[in-house]
Amino acid sequence: MWVGIISLFPEMFRSVTDFGVTGQAVKKGLLSIETWNPRDFTHDKHRTVDDRPYGGGPGMLMMVQPLRDAIQTAKQAAPGKTKVIYLSPQGRKLDQQGVEELATNENLLLICGRYEGVDERIIQSEVDEEWSIGDFVMTGGELPAMTLIDSVSRFVPGVLGDFASAEEDSFANGLLDCPHYTRPEVLDDKDVPSVLKSGNHKDIRRWRLKQSLGRTWLRRPELLENLALTDEQEQLLAEFIKEQRS
């Protein structure tokens, strides 16, 4: 996967390219990340990248010319057809379904806004989709872009050692993840659930599904409203609720 980034602070993306799972993916050639700084496309000695908004009001907008030139240069450098995304509070909220949709693209170009945002005409002419990571305001689009890269890259073949990890994590099936345990067997007088030590894979699968359903019911009940539960899932959830209330 190729990811291009338009940002006034490209150095921030070293945390993606140099560390963790994404850093390893870059080293292996599974993920390619390139950055373009609009400051490099300015024509004045101050390298100005902001401008006043029409109509007045607080704050500034990103200057059109350097931003557009950076976007068009990045598009030309992309290895193929590229989806252009603007990280924006007005965009579609990123969720697991959205992550999986974005992961089907071989090339993504992410535009990170700053100040009060960008000229609406740039969005209309250069952007394919707007995406948000939540209903809150941040100082720029860099951290949302990193979030998107991290979540989407998990679905690039070879990035995770076990691809099933991406399919079984929280939200992959619309549910929160079940609890997990490792050694020691007893920690602060709390034992690992006996079913996980039983070796019975059928019982372990049912326990994990039950806990996943129950945790979703307890913490994010609104997620269940959008799911069509199977008969088995309905039964396991009913058992969990009964146990909680007994």
UniProtKB/Swiss-Prot annotation:
One of its GO terms (cellular component) is cytosol. It is found in: Cytoplasm. Keywords: Cytoplasm, Methyltransferase, S-adenosyl-L-methionine, Transferase, tRNA processing. S-adenosyl-L-methionine binds at G113, I133, G134, D135, F136, V137, M138. It is an enzyme of class 2 (transferase). GO terms for biological process: tRNA N1-guanine methylation. Its EC number is 2.1.1.228. It catalyses: guanosine(37) in tRNA + S-adenosyl-L-methionine = N(1)-methylguanosine(37) in tRNA + S-adenosyl-L-homocysteine + H(+). The keyword Cell membrane does not apply. Its main location: cytoplasm. GO terms for molecular function: tRNA (guanine(37)-N1)-methyltransferase activity. InterPro entries: Alpha/beta_knot_MTases, tRNA_m1G_MeTrfase_C_sf, tRNA_m1G_MeTrfase_TrmD, tRNA_m1G_MTases_N, tRNA_MeTrfase_TRMD/TRM10. Belongs to the RNA methyltransferase TrmD family. Specifically methylates guanosine-37 in various tRNAs. Homodimer. This is tRNA (guanine-N(1)-)-methyltransferase. It comes from Vibrio atlanticus (strain LGP32). The gene is trmD.
